């Protein structure tokens, strides 16, 4: 089924909405813990694609990359007022202010540009409350719902007894922002290459990106893996994570998706690359398998169990007949600062690497049926490894006008209702050429 994605870098009080569970056929009985469950089934990624996945290890490519590159952008931090920040300086309108001016019939009151918005972060600089009262509908909604409104709204939002405190930004963490919206927009939409002027208002490239990211604040997506919601991840005596939502994405699932989507299809997908409570969504760009070696069952046990003499056979998947040890380097796209130029020509400057180490579990025919992460669990000659990603997801597009239950049964929009995807899409189309009217 489809998940409605609002994941982060985001306020952790807002939960993922999904009609999927890890239980089969509505049963309350979980799958065996030693196999990937429905939440980790790679087939979830191809339900809406005319494609079939390959599972035989020998048929899977050792390297691959996305043919359509995801573009870097700011994650528009909450503490900076999200996409209402005046990123070019206080004498230039924010992306939301520009949109209101062109599309929402907003007219700035006299002296508006002399009003000072609140600065980002913990600042003692003065600001003008009248600025926020004068905002147009898109900018005001963004500031109040995705920005730093709680730092100057006269309320004790983090319930610590202090109103509008500077320290801690009234409970706003620095990682909160729109990377959950940037990631699908960057994967699915073409990067704007030129500024676009409408009715005398010029939308710079990062203005355009901010608008498109705003429309992807809630996305349609297929998700693999559960959300880990704790910073205190407990492990057993062998270093294996106990909580299934923190242990997945299953290593076998990860390898199947990585090699099929990037290796065979050239399609980017998204990951939460940190398995703790923080959510850092990133587009996955490419991979290369550094080491792939079929190993014996006893070798697999030795890699996974501190005292191999305590087990008589492989303990994590009773159907596994063959095993492989894998080391893979994965490149992902990172955020950028807002800028007035495209990044298409220096895309590699915004790639970072993770190295993963895992065991693949296979049936007798060599088809992958599961896996176990080794990252940090064993002393290895392969060097340093990253911890496994939390979940993977395949974006399908922005969700139109999602609503949530508000106070007294009211229906509240979950993303900015004053920004139109079709209007922003038209701006993006114009931004592909300097000559389009």
PLM feature spans:
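C-terminal motif of bacterial Sec signal peptides marking the signal peptidase cleavage site
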Residues: 5-8
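Active-site-adjacent structural elements in enzyme catalytic domains
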Residues: 17-154, 159-437
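Bacterial lipoprotein signal-peptidase II cleavage site
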Residues: 10-16
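Sec-dependent signal peptide recognition
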Residues: 1-2
